[in-house]
Amino acid sequence: MDSEIEPYVGEWDEAKEVPQKIYKQMGTRGYLAGLLGMEYQTEYTENRVASVTPEKWDLFHEMLITDELSRAASGGFVWNVIGGFGIGCPPLVKFGQKALVDRILPGILNGDKRICLAITEPDAGSDVANLTCEAKLSEDGKHYIVNGAKKWITNGIWSDYFTTAVRTGKDGMNGISVLLIERAAGGVSTRRMDCQGVWSSGTTYVTFEDVKVPVENLIGKENQGFKGIYASSI
C-alpha cells in the first residue's frame, strides 16, 4: 500500500484506470480467492495469502483486506480491484454448474480475467423486477439469444465475463434468470461512462446484440434468478 498504491491513486483516478499489474497482484497474493464471502477457494487456485492458511481464513480476514485497501482513500481504486469481482463472482461460484465454474473461476482468481455484475438498466435502474434485457431460447435449445442494455456497470469496460440478469419469462421477479455472458462470444460492446467520481472504477454502459450464450451458462434455475442476484451481496 505505502509504496505501490497510495502514491499513485490520484494519477489513476485522472487516468480513469488502475494498472493491470496491480489487479494481477490481487490474484497472485491470494486476495481474490479470499474475498468471495465464503470458504477460501483452494480448488481453483494455488495462490495463497502468505500470513493466513486457508483453513483459518474467515470474514474477519476479508474485512482486514478491504480496510487496508481503503487506506488509499480512493473509492475508484477500491471499486476497481474488488468492486465488479466482489458482486459478480459469488453467484457464479454458488449457483453455476460445476463445469462452468471449473472453466471460468481459475482465470478470475488468478487475476488474469475480470468479471462484473450486470443488472441495472437505462430504464429500470436497480428495479430488477422490471428489467427488459431479454434472453430467448434458440430453436435448437442450445443457446440463449440476448438483446438489451445495462448501465452503470462497475468494471464492465475491462470485464471478460458479465453475470447478467435477463428476462426469460413473464413480467415481474418470477421471469428473471441469470446468465454468465462471455465477451468473447461476440455481440458485446462496452463504453465508459464519465461519472462525477470514482473514475478509475470503470463505470460502463453495456450493450448486448444477438449474443449467443450456451444454456450451460445459466446460473441457477431459469426464471429464478432473484436468488442468484441476492447472492451477489451475501
Predicted regions and their residues:
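Amphipathic, small/basic residue-rich leader segments at the start of a protein or domain
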Residues: 1-82, 99, 103, 107-110
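Glycine-rich phosphate/pyrophosphate-binding beta-alpha loops
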Residues: 124, 151-157, 197, 234
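N-terminal glycine-rich flavin-associated loop
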Residues: 77-99, 125
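A short core secondary-structure module
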Residues: 142-191
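Glycine-rich beta->alpha junctions and the first turn(s) of the following alpha-helix
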Residues: 188-234
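A structural signal for short hydrophobic beta-strand segments in well-ordered beta-sheet cores
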Residues: 133-137
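A short, Trp-centered hydrophobic/proline-enriched beta-strand micro-motif
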Residues: 111-119
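Short glycine/proline-enriched turns and hinge-like loops at secondary-structure junctions
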Residues: 127-129, 155-160, 173-175, 199-201, ...
